Curated annotation (Swiss-Prot):
SUPFAM superfamilies, A to Z: Ribulose-phoshate binding barrel
Transferase found in the keyword field: no
Active site: D12, D131
Functional summary from the UniProt entry: IGPS catalyzes the conversion of PRFAR and glutamine to IGP, AICAR and glutamate. The HisF subunit catalyzes the cyclization activity that produces IGP and AICAR from PRFAR using the ammonia provided by the HisH subunit.
Name of this protein: Imidazole glycerol phosphate synthase subunit HisF
Phylogenetic placement of the source organism: Bacteria, Pseudomonadati, Pseudomonadota, Gammaproteobacteria, Thiotrichales
Domain of life: Bacteria
UniProtKB keywords: Amino-acid biosynthesis, Cytoplasm, Histidine biosynthesis, Lyase
First-listed, main subcellular location of the protein, grouped into a coarse class: cytoplasm
Pfam families named among the record's database cross-references: His_biosynth
Keyword Disulfide bond belongs to the record: no
One of the GO BP terms on file: L-histidine biosynthetic process
Any one GO cellular component localisation term in the record: cytoplasm
């Protein structure tokens, strides 16, 4: 496990544009992924994650161009996810300049795909994204289930068991998003993050719910995550990545400044 904990801004890209508003001061065009990625690079982000939320295959080529463009100008690791369904998709993204590729629903429909991708390209560049919702009634032991389609469709798969299975199949990292917390700005689901982190040996990236800098710190100290991912806290200019790192350092968390 790396000692320094990572901060990863996340950008949703739709048809080649960053969506979920980005409000940087003095950025010419807040919708341009290259501009936004460069700004995060300058702020000291450890990595950047692009999630392509473009629905149609016709527009899929656009994300490839975005990745090529960003990779040519930004030199921190780049993870790309969204619509990755085949070995060819993984190869295309890696060839375009992505360092890692995140596999989400395709892993659920075909777990062997994860193993094949890891065997083909190496575990270090395969991230499995886990979208989980708490399903246990109040007062009962915590239980989370995997949901697909943006948290609308349940699968009946236990999130913690799934995380262990993905590790066994070779995944290099797990991106764990709480669908309950996503967009709430009320902090990570720390119990979910911690339970998965403590169940696997590979790094876990905490995602979903960051509203303030202390939430990022909690993801590491209480959630036992190796990295924390956030979107709007950075996009809306509330905080810079540097401020987040300083807050983490104050908490005794080792970061790369």
């Amino acid at each position: 496990m790396s000692l320094a904990k990572r901060i990863i801004p996340c950008l949703d890209v739709d048809n080649g544009r960053v969506v979920k508003g980005v409000q940087f001061v003095d950025i010419r065009d807040a919708g341009d992924p290259v501009e936004v990625a460069k700004r995060y690079d300058e702020q000291g982000a450890d990595e950047i994650t692009f999630l392509d939320i473009t629905a149609t295959a016709h527009e899929r080529d656009t994300i490839v161009h975005v990745v090529e463009e960003v990779a040519s100008q930004v030199f921190i690791p780049l993870t790309v996810g969204g619509g990755i369904r085949s070995i060819e998709d993984v190869r295309t993204m890696l060839n375009a300049g992505a360092d890692k590729v995140a596999i989400n629903s395709a892993a659920i429909f075909n777990p062997a795909f994860v193993k094949e991708a890891c065997d083909t390209f190496g575990s270090q560049c395969i991230v499995v994204a886990i979208d989980a919702k708490k399903v246990s009634p109040k007062g009962e032991p915590d239980k989370w289930e995997i949901f697909t389609h943006g948290g609308r469709k349940e699968t009946g798969i236990d999130a913690v068991e799934w995380a262990k299975e993905m590790e066994t199949l070779g995944a290099g990292e797990l991106l764990v998003t709480s669908m309950d917390k996503d967009g709430t700005k009320s902090g990570f689901d720390l119990a979910l993050t911690r339970t998965i982190s403590d169940s696997v040996k590979i790094p876990v990236i905490a995602s979903g719910g960051v509203g303030k800098l202390s939430d990022l710190c909690d993801g590491i100290t209480q959630g036992h995550a190796e990295a924390v991912l956030a979107a709007s806290i950075f996009h809306f200019g509330e905080h810079t990545v540097q401020e987040a790192k300083q807050a983490m350092q104050k908490e005794g968390i080792e970061v790369r400044l």
